[in-house]
Design a protein with these regions (language model features):
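Short, conserved glycine- and acidic-residue-centered signature motifs
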Residues: 5, 19, 116
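Basic, amphipathic "hinge/linker" alpha-helix immediately C-terminal to the N-terminal HTH DNA-binding motif
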Residues: 14-30
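Single conserved hydrophobic/aromatic residue that forms the stacking wall/gate
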Residues: 1-13
Length: 155
């Protein structure tokens, strides 16, 4: 069943006209822009109270095993980082990328949520510590892991 499901997903990606190069370029650009947004968000003057609240909500989703809500809360977490970064042009560019390629239903919502919440926690801790380097690195790792997941289903 897993093999069959993987082949169906693989065919969906390939039938959409998306290439391996497109996936790599898409996620590379997201990593650069979202990494920069996380760095900006780590500035001491940035209000991250909303980001902390969204993260706590995502932890509750895990606790309650309400994984169907995770895709929305994931988007909220990322969107709040873009907003808190204070660069409207960057936010618009990242948002446009989010309207394109997505993991969608490539992995189970539960698996996706567990890994993502852990990584979001690492990003948030770096932001709270006002460590721009660590925030940027954690975000880039998070995005590139998503890229690797996508490529797993492509190949």
């Amino acid at each position: 069943l897993h093999l069959s499901l993987r082949r169906q997903r693989q065919m969906c990606i390939r039938d959409s006209g998306v290439t391996e190069t497109y996936i790599k370029e898409h996620y590379q650009l997201r990593a650069i822009l979202e990494g920069a947004a996380a760095r900006l968000c780590a500035a001491p003057e940035t209000d991250i109270s909303e980001l902390e609240e969204i993260y706590q909500d995502s932890c509750k989703i895990l606790e309650n095993k309400d994984f169907s809500r995770y895709t929305d809360i994931n988007r909220e977490f990322h969107n709040e980082i873009w907003t808190a970064a204070g660069n409207g042009k960057m936010k618009n560019m990242i948002s446009e990328l989010w309207n394109g390629l997505s993991m969608g239903n490539m992995v189970s919502e539960e698996d996706y949520a567990k890994v993502s919440v852990k990584e979001h926690g690492e990003i948030l801790e770096a932001i709270k510590a006002h460590d721009g380097d660590a925030a940027e690195a954690a975000m880039k790792e998070h995005i590139m892991r998503s890229r690797d997941d996508m490529l797993t289903y492509y190949n």
